[in-house]
């Protein structure tokens, strides 16, 4: 586990470096800089929390549970962080900032729920994550109009990949867990999360800034 921790934190460090081009490209525009800082920070926090929780050992059950809470809470932060540049830069105005307030409000509520009820069923957590992720459905037409089709494709692909991962996480189907002793639905879920992050990073870097 110590080796996994070292490798995992190294991966987080690489992600932090990978996020820096967003900030470099956004430099000079205060709105872009703020939005991209929030997005990049949310991504780093999610992967840092996940790495620590899945790597720590020789700690009490209470400490482990607290890190589990942090891991789950950061999912809400990443979702809201991913919405931030879309709301502030692409949508803007009353619609953009209303949606921004809504998703961050859901994030705060989700963090409170996880803090008080970490043992809630996986399907319940997944429903909240997925519903929050698709809060943008009412503005889909505007996004399709305002964005190049390739940009909309990357944005949509990220959402779909995240959603598939969430469904796999919730269902925990035996077919996934029977394939390998140390690689099951939970690990597949993490792969889909990384895939969604890559899609949204490409979207942010090439089309939002």
Show which residues each predicted segment covers.
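Small-residue-rich segments of transmembrane alpha-helices in multi-pass membrane proteins
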Residues: 14-16, 69-83, 126-140, 187-199
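Interfacial loop-to-transmembrane junctions
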Residues: 172-195
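C-terminal ends of transmembrane helices
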Residues: 50-65, 108-124, 170-178
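Short, small-residue-biased leader/transition segments that mark boundaries at the very start
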Residues: 2-13
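Alpha-helical membrane segments in multi-pass integral membrane proteins
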Residues: 124-142, 149-171
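Internal transmembrane alpha-helix with an interfacial aromatic "cap," most often the third helix
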Residues: 61, 73-95, 108-119
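Helix-coil boundary and interhelical linker segments in multi-pass alpha-helical membrane proteins
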Residues: 17-36, 82-99, 139-155, 199-209
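Hydrophobic residues within membrane-embedded alpha-helical segments of Major Facilitator Superfamily
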Residues: 14, 38, 45-46, 52-53, ...
């Amino acid at each position: 586990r110590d080796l996994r921790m070292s490798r995992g934190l190294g991966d987080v460090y690489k992600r932090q470096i990978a996020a820096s081009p967003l900030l470099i490209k956004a430099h000079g525009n205060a709105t872009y800089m703020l939005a991209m800082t929030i997005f990049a920070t949310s991504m780093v926090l999610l992967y840092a929390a996940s790495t620590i929780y899945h790597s720590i050992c020789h700690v009490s059950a209470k400490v482990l549970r607290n890190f589990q809470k942090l891991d789950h809470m950061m999912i809400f932060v990443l979702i809201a962080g991913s919405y931030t540049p879309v709301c502030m830069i692409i949508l803007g105005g009353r619609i953009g900032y209303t949606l921004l307030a809504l998703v961050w409000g859901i994030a705060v509520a989700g963090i409170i729920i996880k803090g008080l009820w970490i043992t809630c069923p996986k399907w319940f957590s997944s429903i909240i994550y997925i519903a929050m992720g698709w809060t943008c459905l009412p503005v889909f037409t505007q996004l399709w109009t305002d964005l190049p089709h390739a940009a909309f494709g990357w944005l949509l692909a990220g959402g779909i990949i995240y959603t598939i991962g969430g469904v796999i996480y919730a269902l925990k189907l035996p077919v996934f867990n029977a394939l390998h002793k140390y690689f099951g639905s939970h690990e597949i879920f993490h792969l889909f999360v990384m895939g969604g992050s890559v899609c949204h990073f490409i979207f942010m870097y090439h089309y939002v800034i």
